[in-house]
Structures are given as structure tokens and as C-alpha cells.
Amino acid sequence: MTKLPFGETLTDWGYAGGWLMVRAMPGVLARNVFDAGAWYAARDGGPEQLRKNLARVIGTTPAEVPDSLIRASVASYARYWREAFRLPTMNQAELARRLGRVFIGAEKFAIAREGGRGAVMALPHSGNWDMAGVWLAQNYGTFTTVAERLEPESLYDRFIAYRESLGFEVLPLTGGERPPMDVLAERLRANRFVCLMADRDLTRSGVPVDFFGELTRLPAGPAKLAIETGAPLHPAHVYYDGDDCVVQIDDALDTSSGDVGVITQALADRFAVNIAAHPQDWHMLQPQWLADLSEERRARLEGTGDR
């Protein structure tokens, strides 16, 4: 067996240790530990890229983003990880019942199932999307999603096992036995549900959209699947309200144009409304807009740079 580079081994061990340690902690202690970590991460203005991203959301400059919003955002991100580490040990049925009490638009799943074509749920990285998945798995059985491969491979395998333990079917974005789009379309035709993270695709295959007044790219997958299979495409959103994790399923987008660009822009517009309503829960710490990429990367993206 090929040995992992030492740094990658430490990364995997770190996550494995975190999972074991946080699961074993009393709930109050885990909350205090992650709150302290969030406070530390938000000191001195917090992560620079997070500040740039939130500036677009609230319509200001990075320097004018309130420190209180940065602190709330980092705390929300820390909460996601605290819950993620502890989620497999929670009572899944009870968790689904708690989520169901504050779920907005849950009836759309039943309507979609009656329609016979399943449904595509497209989400941004907001709140705790894994908890939303637990509710769906508990109420409607296994659904299908896609995950990018991580390095090291052992860490990727750990994340896959984690989500499969919650009732998710997880397809690799690359390197699988079949193209993921083929499998997703097959699941929809079998009247099953597909859930996709869809707020960032800074590659040549991404669809150009206007997002908070600036150019970026979003994945084409949700729109393509809806066009190909006739499944409804629902924007979804997850956010925190006090101790509650709220899942919101919006009305299906109009996909009758058959135009991937038009549909993806409509998805971006709905994401923008929902993110603006709960900016602190949008966990986007990477460059989101083309303007934040290096000139070299933008040139490669447009196909004008060296390959």
C-alpha cells in the first residue's frame, strides 16, 4: 500500500481524532470549545475572503463589513462542524422530528413524489445541510448527492462513510464507475430525490451568472437534470434560528425555456435572496466571484491562458 504523505496523514488523523473527541464530549463542553475556536478565528477582523464575500452580500466594502457579522458568521461555521462531528451519535428519528417542527415547504416533497419524477433540490453552503439530509432520509428514504474528492483519499472515504451512515447515497464527482449525471438522472426517473450543493463552480463548465451584482459561475448540473428528466428544480436553503436549524424549500423554478443559462440565473437570484436574509449562515470562505481570482486563473477559466 502506498503511504500517504506525512502532512496528509496528519490531516486525516486530525479529522478522525476530532470526530472521536467531539462525539465523546458532553454537549455543553463541545459548544464551549467550538465557540472559543470561533472567537479566536474571528479576531483581528476574521478571514479576509469571508469578509470580501459578505461585503457583496450586504452591499458594502470589505472594510465596512460589521465585525459583529464576521463573528456571527464564524460562529455559525463552527456550529456546523460541531454538529457534523456529533451528528452520527444523535437520535436520527428524534432529530428529524425536531427539524420537522420548523421545516418550511416540506409538502413539496410529497407533491414531487406524486408527480412521479422525483425532484432536484439545489442548495448553497448555508446552515447545516447535513441535518436537512437527515430529515429527508428519515421521511423519504435514501436520496442521492455528489461530493468532490478530497485529499488524502482516506479523508474522502471517511466523509463518504459519515454521510452514508446518515442515509445518503454519495456519488464521487470524478473517478466513479459511471458519470454522476447519468446516475442522478436515473435516480430522478425512478422518482427519487437528488440534492446538490450549487452555489459555486469556478471552472470552465460553470454557468456564468450575475450574483449580487457581480459575475461568477454556478454548476450547470441542477438545470441540466431538470431539463433532461422533467423533474422539478427547487431552490432550498438552510439557516439557523436560535437553537433551531430551519430548512426551507422554495417553489420550483420555471424550467420550460430549456435554457441552462436562464434557469441557472434564476437559481442564482433565489440563492441571493435567501443568503441576504441570513448572511451569517452562508459558509463561503473561498473566492466566490471571478474578480477575486488571480489574472492567471481567470485567463485559464476563459480559455485564453496557457494550458
What kind of feature is each model-predicted range?
Residues R101-V102, S126, P152, T174-R178, ...:
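A conditional alpha-helix N-cap/helix-loop micro-motif detector
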